Amino acid sequence: MSKELSPKYNPAEVEAGRYQKWLDEDVFKPSGDKKAKPYSIVIPPPNVTGKLHLGHAWDTTLQDIIIRQKRMQGFDTLWLPGMDHAGIATQAKVEARLAESGISRYDLGREKFLDKVWEWKDEYAATIKEQWGKMGLSVDYSRERFTLDEGLSKAVRKVFVELYKKGWIYRGEFIINWDPKARTALSDIEVIHKDVEGAFYHMNYMLEDGSRALEVATTRPETMFGDTAVAVNPNDDRYKDLIGKNVILPILNKPIPIVGDEHADPEFGTGVVKITPAHDPNDFLVGQRHNLPQVNVMNDDGTMNELAGEFNGMDRFEARKAIVKKLEEIGALVEIEKMTHSVGHSERTGVPVEPRLSTQWFVKMDQLAKNAIANQDTDDKVDFYPPRFNDTFLQWMENVHDWVISRQLWWGHQIPAWYNAEGEIYVGEEAPEGDGWKQDEDVLDTWFSSALWPFSTMGWPDVDSEDFKRYFPTSTLVTGYDIIFFWVSRMIFQSLEFTGRQPFKNVLIHGLIRDEQGRKMSKSLGNGIDPMDVIEKYGADALRWFLSNGSAPGQDVRFSYEKMDASWNFINKIWNISRYILMNNEGLTLDVARENVAKVAAGQAGNVTDRWILHNLNETIRKVTENFDKFEFGVAGHILYNFIWDEFADWYVELTKEVLYSDNEDEKVITRSVLLYTLDQILRLLHPIMPFVTEEIFGQISEGSIVTAEYPVARPEFENEEAAAGVEALKDVIRSVRNSRAEVNVAPSKPITILIKTSDSKLDAFFNDNINYIKRFTNPEHLEIAADVEVPDLVMSSIITGAEIYLPLADLLNVEEELARLEKELAKWQKELDMVGKKLSNERFVANAKPEVVQKERDKQKDYQAKYDAIVVRIDEMKKLVK
């Protein structure tokens, strides 16, 4: 153990090589202690689509805080890392890279294209692991998993087959969300709805007998070639006599029937609705009720097919313009009604999705959802933090639709279904025997395999595997509220179905990282922050402190460099007080310090400030542990900050100088012991949040790694309310004198008279017993503490519990000079107020300047006014004193 830290805190030096050393020492693996209670977390697997962003840094920091604390508390901890193949997202990235060279996946073919995707995966998996290391994540790499690993693939096949056998996976032709760019189906929750400028196109469909026209309206006229009927409400007197007759479909000039169906709302539009069963989910249901043909008029890539006649091969949106023009030419266009409406867009490619009839594989959700809902009323329920997200989960499960799980991609788990020439389907974990079978080319939705993550990573379907028996169900899941539907809910219902248990006991839901203005970080806004850039400037510990200290379950966090500066300053403060303690340590060991601290707690040694700091340390340990248990890391961080900076550094360390600068060697040893012991406990409390710097400092005072050191526990023998109250009263006196000096601009170096009039005999005795502390911090020329102290006429006074503090003004200032100074200061702020007031009264400025600029001026005005008002009050007080 070296007893010296470098003079200046340098995070790059502190963090360099430390992570690799931890890995070499195997400190992140489970302890293997069968007597210890297990605590496990599976990392939400990041997509191998690219580098991790600030949201990932937040998510993994919270997990690392939990697992590091539990490890120190003696739990047998497992934090299992891994990554997700992220089917559509990764395939889109690789296709984009190939497109830069003018190559498509079809040019390469499936096998060679997948080779390229695996190369991409290896490249970005290495990058992600490097980022994990920079963040200091204490994961067990010996158990690292990937969603396309053979073990996980086996689990995927088994789940698919079992659900198929139960009739809960089925294949059918239904309207689904189609992504024309990725050329694949999407589930409902992979579709993001955006308000876009569009139009209602009103068209006339002439009755076959030519007697009249029926007006219909659509936002997608390009689908009209798939119209197989128009519908009217059977109770609509305007049209019910027309049911059973035909209208002529414009452009194609073919007859289609008029059907009576309650889907047509007499109160909406004209009450006549065009029915396109292959391109609209509601029309599909109408078509089923009336046995209408299903006509698909688009290709996989969003171009029109041969059924669109002269528009064959045109992109759907180009076709829209051309069709509207044609309708106008033939006199079938009534009007174009501009409007804003909600249009579904692919979450991954960003293009508008196309509702489209397609043959896909689905998971039947009824019973799975019922099981998940019912489980929340049992002892095996999942606890959400904050609890309001339990309602979010239940609401979604109660309204869930069947889940389309097939994707027309190449990257992913190929569906374990085979077909032969006779039209037979074989579903199994292994390929069927014999010739003539061809496997379904589609792959499964990424979320299908991700839903099995908590138990497939533990060895399932081998329920006898050691990890599955020991660490499943997992203890806690940490994730963002944006994927409760995508992932959390699916893990719950799949785990209940296949293991009979919930996948995790707790779910900690966090929000999103936003910029300083509260905007979501995005490429389009250019406001994204690379966590590695932040680490390079401030260090991982500072970033982790910011992410945890601003964290409240379920709430968003605003990133700012000002807060990062504050984080770095806090760590620098810890570094400096650690150096002070070590420089004054005089060879004291932690074991000896513990023995001496025990004597202080027993009242056999030390002074009241020693007992006070141990009492407050004890309270801090208790409160931090309580808040960690509730995942209130932000609250815990504030408690730690206040204790370390305010109570320990600003007060206790300063108070110890009264002893350390004395000649009493016995008292010095006790004080050094309390300093060293408290520092040790602070480092242990901070370690889950700041692993690097705490390990560096801990190495100066103890053997071994802090990673596996014992986490602090509150000790009853440290409780000392009397010492706590006494020192708080001392602090009140010192603060009162300091504040009075500051009010009248009297330097701390100037000796003054201080009179303390007590009304409590115990407090009187306490102040007199500890008068040296008051003298050290207040610099009195004369100090008197008594119940009958004489108070002169002109004084500054303040009141604390049990005493009044008086400072004779004659010692403090020349009142006339102070009044002159205050009048000058008042004029200065009046000038500032006039300037900002003039700017804000300028209507052109307020109307044309950016809102944040205007707000900044208003904030200035408020600040200046507060300063002006405070000086006015001070002048009034001074004038009263003169009288």
Curated annotation (Swiss-Prot):
Catalyzes the attachment of valine to tRNA(Val). As ValRS can inadvertently accommodate and process structurally similar amino acids such as threonine, to avoid such errors, it has a 'posttransfer' editing activity that hydrolyzes mischarged Thr-tRNA(Val) in a tRNA-dependent manner. It holds the Pfam family Anticodon_1. Monomer. One of its GO terms (biological process) is valyl-tRNA aminoacylation. The lineage of its organism: Bacteria, Bacillati, Bacillota, Bacilli, Lactobacillales. Keywords: Aminoacyl-tRNA synthetase, ATP-binding, Coiled coil, Cytoplasm, Ligase, Nucleotide-binding, Protein biosynthesis. This is Valine--tRNA ligase. It catalyses: tRNA(Val) + L-valine + ATP = L-valyl-tRNA(Val) + AMP + diphosphate. A motif ('KMSKS' region) lies at residues 520-524. GO terms for cellular component: cytosol.
